[in-house]
């Protein structure tokens, strides 16, 4: 009877009840308040708690308020303290430790650029990007790289102007990545990768613009995703032929491939023209082709903490971990759903996978593998999750693009998406640059949402 009585008390907290909380933060010193516990109403949510912290910081003076988020045991508080206590089965005798941190405000629309066709892939580069730092070059501003269903790779400046177009693929381009401020790699439905030489304003003025320096061949189906490691000069590719390809950013590191001249009256004029242009371009074979998946590979990424390790996602429902030294699969995890994208959150030791089941799974690759080994599941999209991008300066945050026409902003410490950015039509690609979140898709537009300061 005593247990039942206590349980009844816990689940009938009133709006006038109070609970002791202890505020603490890892923010800079001038945002720290006393860690002595104080009583607050259990009805408070993050906005009310933020008002209290601002009042304590300003010592009663009227100053511009700083919005804060609050974490309890590492999880973002998205309910009232009353709901938290009830869910955890705790009484108001509990002292709640509340960590506060600057809130991430909703991104605001910055710009939209029009493209000629559907945009399949987006990548960005900026002065502090790893590709720039590894190249010892200088870059004045962020640049946008896009791959399109019309077979053209384009670079844009932040004013929306097309700086260069790269024509060579004989079908839709499915993935693009910066290698350096003057070099890019693309892949597409024509089964090939292309290394390009580009020239950006203020960078290597002698560079020849728009030149394919090498065609990389080895896949037997469309190549749908790429990842680049700037320090090891490695490229990895995901193919619909169920194979993961390994390449070099330097053509001289790969073996030459001899290709006979194309023949046949059924070849279109466009293909004949492109084939003639390509006849003088060197072709290279992969460093390795890694078999193991039973269905198309849809996403690949390097392990930021160990560049000899990569991860791949596939429609065969699995995430595989590969050792590049031996070119062997060292771990396989089954998810029960077709996987369409993959992203590593290195400082959290997590790998995120987007699925055809509309959710995002978070996996810890250090944990022993077993069926449905999932650390967390993020639910919110209503269609395929096909692309993801990590926040450049916040370890816990990333963005996801979906065929439901939205880009969602996530914090892995919360159960739901932080914000939803709408687009017209399916979204195929997303990148997160310091200037903002850049996405493209079926509406033939590149949209930029700026992060609020």
Swiss-Prot record:
WD repeats lie at residues 128-166, 168-206, 218-257, 292-332, 334-373, 380-420, 422-453. Keywords: Nucleus, Repeat, Ribosome biogenesis, rRNA processing, WD repeat. It is found in: Nucleus, Nucleolus; Nucleus, Nucleoplasm. Residues 19-102 are annotated as: Ubiquitin-like (UBL) domain. InterPro entries: G-protein_beta_WD-40_rep, NLE, WD40/YVTN_repeat-like_dom_sf, WD40_repeat_CS, WD40_repeat_dom_sf, WD40_rpt, WDR12/Ytm1. SMART domains: WD40. Residues 112-453 are annotated as: Sufficient for interaction with ERB1 and association with 66S pre-ribosomes. One of its GO terms (biological process) is chromosome organization. Pfam families: NLE, WD40. GO terms for cellular component: nucleoplasm; PeBoW complex; preribosome, large subunit precursor. Its main location: nucleus. GO terms for molecular function: ribonucleoprotein complex binding. HAMAP family: WDR12. PANTHER family: RIBOSOME BIOGENESIS PROTEIN WDR12, WD40 REPEAT PROTEIN 12, 37. Component of the NOP7 complex, composed of ERB1, NOP7 and YTM1. The complex is held together by ERB1, which interacts with NOP7 via its N-terminal domain and with YTM1 via a high-affinity interaction between the seven-bladed beta-propeller domains of the 2 proteins. The NOP7 complex associates with the 66S pre-ribosome. Interacts (via UBL domain) with MDN1 (via VWFA/MIDAS domain). Component of the NOP7 complex, which is required for maturation of the 25S and 5.8S ribosomal RNAs and formation of the 60S ribosome. Belongs to the WD repeat WDR12/YTM1 family. This is Ribosome biogenesis protein YTM1. The gene is YTM1.
């Amino acid at each position: 009877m005593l247990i039942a009585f206590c349980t009844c008390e816990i689940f009938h907290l009133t709006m006038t009840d109070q609970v002791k909380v202890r505020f603490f933060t890892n923010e800079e010193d001038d945002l720290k308040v006393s860690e002595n516990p104080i009583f607050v109403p259990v009805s408070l949510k993050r906005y009310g708690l933020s008002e209290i912290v601002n009042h304590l910081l300003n010592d009663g003076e009227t100053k511009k308020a700083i919005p804060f988020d609050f974490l309890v045991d590492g999880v973002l508080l998205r309910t009232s303290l009353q709901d938290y206590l009830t869910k955890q089965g705790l009484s108001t005798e509990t002292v709640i430790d509340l960590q506060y941190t600057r809130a991430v405000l909703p991104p605001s629309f910055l710009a939209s650029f029009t493209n000629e066709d559907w945009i399949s892939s987006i990548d960005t580069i900026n002065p502090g990007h790893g590709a720039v730092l590894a190249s010892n070059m200088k870059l004045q501003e962020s640049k946008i790289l896009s791959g399109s269903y019309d077979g053209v790779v384009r670079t844009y400046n932040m004013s929306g102007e097309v700086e260069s177009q790269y024509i060579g693929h004989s079908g839709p381009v499915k993935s693009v990545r910066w290698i350096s401020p003057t070099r890019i790699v693309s892949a597409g439905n024509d089964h090939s990768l292309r290394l390009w030489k580009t020239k950006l304003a203020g960078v290597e003025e002698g560079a020849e613009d728009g030149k394919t320096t090498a065609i990389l061949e080895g896949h037997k189906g469309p190549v749908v995703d790429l990842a680049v490691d700037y320090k090891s000069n490695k490229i990895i590719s995901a193919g619909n032929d169920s194979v993961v390809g390994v390449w070099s950013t330097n053509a001289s590191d790969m073996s030459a491939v001899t290709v006979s001249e194309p023949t046949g009256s059924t070849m279109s004029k466009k293909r004949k023209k492109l084939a003639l242009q390509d006849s003088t371009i060197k072709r290279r074979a992969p460093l390795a082709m890694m078999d193991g998946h039973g269905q198309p590979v849809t996403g690949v990424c390097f392990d930021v903490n160990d560049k000899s390790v990569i991860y791949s996602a596939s429609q065969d429902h699995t995430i595989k971990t590969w050792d590049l030294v031996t070119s062997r699969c060292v771990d396989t995890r089954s998810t029960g759903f077709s996987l369409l994208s993959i992203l590593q959150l290195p400082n959290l030791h997590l790998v995120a996978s987007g699925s055809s089941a509309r959710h995002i799974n978070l996996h810890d690759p250090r944990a022993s593998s077993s069926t449905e080994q999932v650390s967390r599941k993020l639910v919110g999209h209503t269609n395929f999750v096909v692309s993801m991008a990590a926040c450049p300066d916040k370890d816990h945050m990333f963005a996801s693009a979906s065929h439901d026409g939205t880009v969602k902003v996530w914090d892995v410490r919360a159960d739901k998406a932080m914000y939803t950015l709408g687009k017209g039509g399916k979204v195929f690609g997303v990148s997160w640059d310091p200037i903002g979140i850049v996405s493209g898709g079926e509406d033939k537009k590149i949209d930029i949402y700026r992060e609020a300061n």
